[in-house]
Amino acid sequence: MLTRPREIYLATAVSIGILLSLIAPLGPPLARADGTSQLAELVDAAAERLEVADPVAAFKWRAQLPIEDSGRVEQQLAKLGEDARSQHIDPDYVTRVFDDQIRATEAIEYSRFSDWKLNPASAPPEPPDLSASRSAIDSLNNRMLSQIWSHWSLLSAPSCAAQLDRAKRDIVRSRHLDSLYQRALTTATQSYCQALPPA
């Protein structure tokens, strides 16, 4: 019995659908259904962590403390490396990402110190205690690490750079980041797309 054209069409459509369903998982989509980057939450957490630089700088200025605290940095990076290892994420990648984040944060603090050196009256008179800011930083570190784990495959995919650029544009717009924060965000995220492909 001859196959009718409609049956041929349906069979072909089904075959194409199956083929596409097999191909689709091979690469992450460039954006979610709402048009936002899949890296938006990670980049937003990085931006929020950068914003903690302002109250930290204000406290250090009033307390006459140095901006850089190598002991605290080493402690943070060691813990993050251990946490990454426990989640089967490359610890070298994680420590590199957070080292970038810390250097970007310190750059903002140095900028604030420079402003207040020129105009001491512009410094916040009663900054929040440093412990509150550090608690916020620890929480944001965990949030960022969770996002890295969730998007590990994407961070090593060819589409990572495009997703990262989209996420940065969206976060700059939504958080109204000025030029200083935009440069800091670029530094903080510069190693995101250097993850090794999953074994």
Swiss-Prot record:
Keywords: Disulfide bond, Isomerase, Secreted, Signal. InterPro entries: Chorismate_II_sf (IPR036263), Chorismate_mutase-related (IPR051331), Chorismate_mutase_periplasmic (IPR008240), CM_dom_sf (IPR036979), CM_II_prokaryot (IPR002701). It comes from the Bacteria. Optimum pH is 7.5. The activity is dramatically affected under alkaline conditions (pH 9.5). Changing residue 105 to A: 20% of the wild-type enzyme activity. GO terms for biological process: chorismate metabolic process; salicylic acid biosynthetic process. Tyrosine, phenylalanine, and tryptophan moderately enhance chorismate mutase activity at low concentrations, but allosterically inhibit the enzyme at higher concentrations. Residues 1-33 form the signal peptide. Gene3D superfamilies: Chorismate mutase (1.20.59.10). It is found in: Secreted. GO terms for cellular component: extracellular region. Residues 34-113 form the Chorismate mutase domain. Changing residue 109 to A: 10% of the wild-type enzyme activity. Substrate binds at residues 49, 60, 69, 72-76, 105-109, 134. Optimum temperature is between 37 to 50 degrees Celsius. An increase in temperature does increase enzyme activity, and complete reversible denaturation of the enzyme occurs at a temperature close to 60 degrees Celsius. The keyword Disulfide bond applies. GO terms for molecular function: chorismate mutase activity. Its EC number is 5.4.99.5. The keyword Transport does not apply. Homodimer. Was identified as a high-confidence drug target. In the presence of high concentrations of tyrosine, phenylalanine, and tryptophan, the enzyme is completely protected from proteolytic degradation. Catalyzes the Claisen rearrangement of chorismate to prephenate. May play some role in the pathogenicity. This is Secreted chorismate mutase. It comes from Mycobacterium tuberculosis (strain ATCC 25618 / H37Rv).
